[in-house]
């Protein structure tokens, strides 16, 4: 086990590791236990009763958080014609087709989200070795493969986050910054929570949400009551 520093130890003293907190109490505690010398992210971790090896239990999607993420996001769009113009008008940081594919192949990686029209995916697919390991490959399930490039760009800029179950049947995503109000963080959490519940596979067995915790970056985890989350 890694040895934690003094600040972490002091923060952890405020958390009862045997208690399952309500959403409101957990959010309040996250703000109180953040000790980073920057505006830390507030992160949520779920462990679900799903089998990621089963195709119908590979949960993945996106949600626009009502209060945004607190982060400035750079978006590039692979599109041509009207879809390219719409993406530019919506505020995309870079829009292109073959020229943008070549630019990325040559090492350009100064972006956080990639959007593409369906027609461009054959060309974007050539970037799989670059985009895939970074989780940047566009996907219809997350709204990043679409003809409505303007809406996709607007959603990302407004605070869209992706959620995806990993091999351990866990989901990790950020819901904002410590500087957000408790109400803003709670609203964002509820939006993510509702999306996770809606994504429950029909074939999932047992208690869907096995555990859930929130934490500030570097801060101690605060466990929530999974039964209450499913009520």
Swiss-Prot record:
Gene3D superfamilies: 3.30.190.20, 3.40.50.790
GO cellular component: large ribosomal subunit
Signal peptide annotation: none
SUPFAM superfamilies reported in the protein's UniProt record: Ribosomal protein L1 (SSF56808)
GO biological process: regulation of translation; translation
A GO molecular function held by the record: tRNA binding
Highest taxon listed in the record's lineage: Bacteria
Keywords: Repressor, Ribonucleoprotein, Ribosomal protein, RNA-binding, rRNA-binding, Translation regulation, tRNA-binding
Similarity comment text for this entry: Belongs to the universal ribosomal protein uL1 family.
Quaternary structure note: Part of the 50S ribosomal subunit.
Function per UniProt: Binds directly to 23S rRNA. The L1 stalk is quite mobile in the ribosome, and is involved in E site tRNA release.
Protein name in UniProt: Large ribosomal subunit protein uL1
Native source organism of the sequence: Lactobacillus delbrueckii subsp. bulgaricus (strain ATCC 11842 / DSM 20081 / BCRC 10696 / JCM 1002 / NBRC 13953 / NCIMB 11778 / NCTC 12712 / WDCM 00102 / Lb 14)
